[in-house]
């Protein structure tokens, strides 16, 4: 049923839709193979091209429904973490490490109730967007007097549309998060540069003040020494002028 639905979608959509449907079909085929839980398939799934965005949805990483319990999440984590652990896949250790990190990150995210709620909100938003879009299209078709049947009436194609929109929302949020982090990092860097500049300016001012005071003390000492030397010379000179006149002996006849 899924295969025929996807084939029909490929024939009716544009090139972008056809590409997505082909991709989605391949993903579903991989997921079907993954149901046997082999290390090779799981590592391939978690490290395939574009995995940095595909792995943003923690439920997709662990291949579980959003409605599962925390106990089921833990059980699934144990299964996948054992399968992709680098120690068990030493012939493909680098990719195994990357896959293990993706599984570990998804598991920890779902243990955090706040982050889990955010992920659920994104999934719900994707579903509501598709439902709204389908409703508007049906309304427009009815207005035009045309049959209101749309491809999303097929449950499998509806799931595909939700999957596509959800993946898009996760990607958009990740891009915004990175932009926000880059902006915050730039702001922290700017503030740090201003702090360093202020510290250097204060240091230069302290050094200038210190040098000024030291040179001022030197100038004062030089002036005092000059005054003392000048005064001493004057006193010595005055003492020279105050010498008593020589007494001339009177000669008697």
UniProtKB/Swiss-Prot annotation:
State where composition is biased (Basic residues): 231-240
Question: Which residue ranges does the UniProt annotation give for the motif Nuclear localization signal?
Answer: 189-192, 203-206
InterPro entries from the entry? DnaJ_domain, DNAJC8, J_dom_sf
Residue ranges occupied by any J domain in the UniProt entry: 57-124
**Which Gene Ontology CC terms are recorded?**
cytosol; intercellular bridge; nucleoplasm; nucleus
Mind telling me which SUPFAM superfamilies this protein's record contains?
Chaperone J-domain (SSF46565)
Residues modified as N6-acetyllysine are: 146
Biased composition (Basic and acidic residues) is annotated at 181-222
Q: How does it assemble?
A: Interacts with SRPK1. Interacts with HSP70 (HSPA1A or HSPA1B).
The record's function comment reads: Suppresses polyglutamine (polyQ) aggregation of ATXN3 in neuronal cells.
This protein's name: DnaJ homolog subfamily C member 8
Q: Which gene encodes it?
A: Dnajc8
